[in-house]
Amino acid sequence: MGIRKLKPTTPGQRHKVIGAFDKITASTPEKSLVVGKKKTGGRNNTGKMTMRYIGGGHKQKYRFIDFKRTKDGIPATVKTIEYDPNRSSRIALLYYADGAKAYIIAPDGLEVGHTVMSGSEAAPEVGNALPLANIPVGTIIHNIELRPGQGAKMVRSAGSFAQLTSREGTYVVIKMPSGEVRRILSTCKATIGSVGNSDHALEKSGKAGRSRWLGRRPHNRGVVMNPVDHPMGGGEGRQSGGHPRSRKGLYAKGLKTRAPKKHSSKYIIERRKK
């Protein structure tokens, strides 16, 4: 995809690094695959704040993404590559041979005019979705299901990818982007290739206003608050705040948050790297 670094004509432009939109081929989404999205401002149904530092931002429409890829054996042509405000990756609009339309996450290398397919008969090529049992060992994959037919849950953000490293009976062993190595049922589907827009990690907003466009409000440190607002607040003058804690009082560094008897722990061969 590439990035753009702007000339320092204003203070907000000086450090601004944004993604290039040269690969995007359509500016308006497919009308049948979008729906209005109501912002919550970080409040729940009773109006209480449940998530801090969220609010405002530009209006967005949600694009329905096909994470299940259930139309097996039906070829689809890539019609457009589009921007999606709801995720870091780009999305691709597919026109199926039977007339159906769907959005998928656009993998790196997928272009307008390419043909993709899903199912066990599909070739292990970029953009095709196959059961893990049919994917060769060593292949780079993304959009991985945790349970068969559930839809892709893992490895969906821009530039991310996992690798199928080996097979163990009815399971395959996959190395995740975090470094975690885990087993997944071989009947689960995954898509070949890595997620596109890999330069997303290099972007810099350049100014606070661009964060506000995305619905992100100023994030205040606990140590500058009052004791009534945060466990690390208060004190005469500038204080360290003591042992780092979250607003709820939980230790912020080193505390294990994973349930000790979680069912899925038996599938994890090697924990993620710090």
From Swiss-Prot:
GO MF, one annotated term: structural constituent of ribosome
Superkingdom, taxonomy of origin: Bacteria
Disordered: region residues: 197-274
A Pfam family the protein falls into: Ribosomal_L2
HAMAP family in the cross-refs: Ribosomal_uL2_B
Subunit structure of this chain's protein: Part of the 50S ribosomal subunit. Forms a bridge to the 30S subunit in the 70S ribosome.
Full protein name: Large ribosomal subunit protein uL2
